[in-house]
């Protein structure tokens, strides 16, 4: 889901780094090269606020504005990796239904090809870089970070933290077909950790990621979609897909004894609802109709767009601290457990 880019002059956000434009990146006087990936609305707003006429924006793409994920809100940007972008998207389609380990290794391979192409296009006058996390280790491999300062725009947890969270979940879950299907190579994990430690700023709207970098994290404000006024209800929902790392086992325990079956959104990728009655629904227009609360015990969430939609519509969320939302926008999973003991059903009235 892509939302319109907002103006920093009219968005009304005061907790965002962009509330005082120019402070966020503490930009140096030299030319800045921005090497970015997907145009998240939060990052696009930042670029729109801070990009200077002499700056350089290098992004993937096939033609300007296509695919839509690369639709940056500026005219002054260059497609520096067209053939590599085509290869990336073809590969993504080819492995879309492959096991997670195969998909992730494919993505990393093509990220490397794109990053090296972008590195070759960096203006020699650029002494500071703002780089997407996807490109970070490969830009270093290409020598593009040498003699330059850089900020990192983070869209996922660092590999080291991903591994830690997955190992922690695996220890609780036991056997799973997917919880251990991918681990990045140790050299890549170490390189990313070293480069993140060197970065001047870590830029992200994700509160969990930002918490890993105290004193250096620059918070962006999540863009919330406009409210849709869904039909009121008191049903409890689990935000899928159903896969071990989303922790449906926790949702099962929390909703045991409820009068109505748990609503499970998204595809079922692992058989984890055996002997449990659920009501399956698809994520589409009106998906929040009748929902009184959302359970989201996922091991980690990188881009919580559906959670943001729930927040915008006043639907209570019970989630882990790795969900990415601001603490005021969700309640800890433990709060739902305590309430569930006190009452067999959480209604829209008691959840507010």
PLM features: what roles do these ranges have?
Residues 316-320:
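Short hydrophobic beta-strand element within catalytic cores of glycosyltransferases
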Residues 292, 314:
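A short alpha->beta transition loop at the rim of the catalytic pocket in nucleotide-sugar-dependent
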Residues 46, 222-285:
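Conserved catalytic-core segment of nucleotide-activated headgroup transferases in glycan assembly
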Residues 285-286, 304-312, 323-326:
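Short alpha-helical segment that forms part of, or immediately flanks, the ligand-binding pocket
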Residues 1-82:
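N-terminal subdomain of nucleotide-sugar transferases
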Residues 113-121, 158, 171-201, 289:
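Membrane-proximal helix-turn-helix segments that form the acceptor-binding/catalytic region
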Residues 93-101, 152-187:
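Acceptor-binding helix/loop patch of EC 2.4 sugar-transfer enzymes
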Residues 299:
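Aromatic "clamp/platform" in nucleotide-sugar-dependent glycosyltransferases that forms part
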């Amino acid at each position: 889901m892509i939302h319109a880019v907002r103006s920093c002059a009219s968005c009304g956000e005061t907790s965002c780094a962009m509330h005082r434009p120019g402070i966020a990146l503490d930009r140096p006087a030299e030319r800045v090269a921005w090497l970015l990936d997907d145009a998240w609305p939060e990052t696009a707003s930042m670029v729109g606020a801070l990009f200077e006429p002499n700056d350089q924006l290098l992004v993937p793409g096939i033609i300007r504005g296509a695919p839509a994920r690369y639709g940056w809100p500026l005219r002054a940007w260059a497609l520096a990796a067209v053939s590599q972008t085509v290869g990336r998207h073809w590969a993504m389609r080819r492995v879309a239904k492959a096991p997670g380990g195969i998909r992730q290794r494919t993505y990393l391979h093509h990220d490397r090809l794109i990053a090296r192409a972008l590195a070759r296009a960096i203006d020699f006058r650029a002494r500071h870089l703002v780089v997407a996390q996807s490109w970070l280790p490969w830009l270093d491999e290409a020598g593009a970070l040498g003699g330059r300062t850089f900020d990192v725009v983070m869209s996922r947890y660092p590999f080291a933290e991903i591994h830690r969270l997955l190992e922690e979940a695996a220890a609780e879950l036991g056997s799973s077909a997917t919880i251990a299907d991918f681990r990045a190579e140790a050299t890549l994990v170490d390189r990313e950790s070293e480069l993140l430690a060197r970065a001047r700023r870590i830029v992200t709207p994700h509160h969990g990621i930002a918490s890993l970098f105290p004193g250096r994290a620059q918070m962006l404000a999540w863009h919330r979609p406009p409210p849709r006024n869904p039909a009121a209800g008191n049903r409890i929902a689990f935000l899928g897909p159903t896969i071990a790392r989303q922790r449906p086992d926790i949702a099962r325990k929390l909703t045991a004894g409820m009068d109505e079956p748990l609503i499970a959104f998204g595809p079922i990728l692992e058989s984890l609802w055996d002997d449990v009655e659920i009501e399956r629904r698809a994520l589409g227009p009106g998906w929040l109709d009748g929902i009184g609360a959302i359970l989201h015990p996922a091991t980690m969430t990188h881009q919580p767009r559906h959670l943001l939609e729930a927040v915008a519509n006043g639907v209570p969320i019970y989630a882990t601290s790795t969900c990415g939302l601001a603490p005021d926008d969700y309640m800890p999973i433990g709060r739902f457990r305590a309430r569930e003991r006190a009452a067999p059903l959480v209604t829209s009235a008691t959840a507010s």
